[in-house]
């Protein structure tokens, strides 16, 4: 007997990309306090973001109450959809969340961590390490096995673009819009929304932008928001953004 294809739904194999919330401690009180501190200042940046709880950074034998962490994330308006764990962490299946497989090789770059506020990662701070601005828009390292995605339309508030390789945007990214890439991001227009590069732990990824006015910028989990205003010499200017020793460095670009 043959079965007709349903006109109403299909079940197909596929994959869904999500960001990782990496748990580094079993002290849930400290974790809760840090969550509140981290997100109360900029709640809208992460509202309704889908995340997977990553417990691979915990030491062997350590366990946490994943149901409590799930509730913590719900309290800050994030949506946990699964758990990423080592094969030896069988207890992770007890939370009632599905076990997910992460593609990253470094083992846990979670939701972005803020750049060190004690040393603002701006062009002035990077002067000693890089005395001259970068000469051109060029990717720092190729992303293997993934095609570059090119977007030539404006992105409005609420829209999101995800690229498995490098991402090139040729139109403005408005407030409330989000662009995410596993590789580098090139924006040949004003960036007023959020840009997250190297989201699966690519510390060599960079962001290149001809007009920097962002809500948030992030590379490999290290992020910076407008809570820490950008200096006048890079705000609205052409820049490149890279990581140096876990700090975001924002440097002018020489385009002529």
From Swiss-Prot:
Residues 105-143 are annotated as: Disordered. Keywords: Cell cycle, Cell division, Septation. GO terms for biological process: cell morphogenesis; division septum assembly; regulation of cell division; regulation of cell septum assembly. Residues 120-142 have a biased composition (Low complexity). Coiled coil: none annotated. Cell division inhibitor that blocks the formation of polar Z ring septums. Rapidly oscillates between the poles of the cell to destabilize FtsZ filaments that have formed before they mature into polar Z rings. Prevents FtsZ polymerization. Belongs to the MinC family. Interacts with MinD and FtsZ. This is Probable septum site-determining protein MinC. The lineage of its organism: Bacteria, Pseudomonadati, Pseudomonadota, Betaproteobacteria, Burkholderiales.
């Amino acid at each position: 007997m043959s079965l007709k294809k349903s006109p109403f739904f299909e079940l197909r194999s596929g994959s869904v990309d999500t960001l990782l919330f990496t748990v580094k401690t079993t002290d849930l009180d400290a974790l809760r306090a840090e969550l509140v501190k981290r997100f109360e200042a900029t709640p809208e940046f992460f509202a309704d973001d889908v995340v997977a709880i990553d417990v691979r950074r915990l030491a062997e034998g350590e366990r946490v109450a994943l149901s409590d962490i799930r509730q913590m994330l719900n309290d800050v308006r994030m949506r946990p959809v699964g758990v990423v764990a080592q094969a030896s962490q069988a207890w992770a299946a007890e939370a009632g969340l599905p076990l997910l497989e992460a593609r990253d090789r470094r083992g846990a770059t979670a939701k972005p961590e803020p750049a060190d506020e004690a040393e603002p990662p701006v062009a002035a701070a990077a002067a000693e390490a890089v005395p001259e601005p970068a000469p051109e828009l060029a990717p720092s390292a190729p992303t293997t096995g993934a095609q570059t995605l090119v977007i030539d339309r404006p992105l409005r508030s609420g829209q999101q673009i995800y690229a498995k390789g490098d991402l090139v945007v040729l139109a403005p990214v408005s407030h409330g819009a989000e662009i995410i890439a596993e590789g580098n991001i090139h924006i040949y227009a004003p960036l007023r929304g959020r840009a997250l590069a190297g989201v699966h732990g690519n510390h060599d990824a960079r962001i290149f932008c001809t007009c920097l006015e962002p809500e948030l910028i992030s590379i490999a989990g290290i992020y910076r928001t407008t809570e820490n205003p950008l200096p006048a010499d890079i705000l609205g200017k052409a820049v490149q953004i890279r990581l140096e020793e876990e700090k975001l460095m924002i440097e002018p670009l020489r385009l002529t």
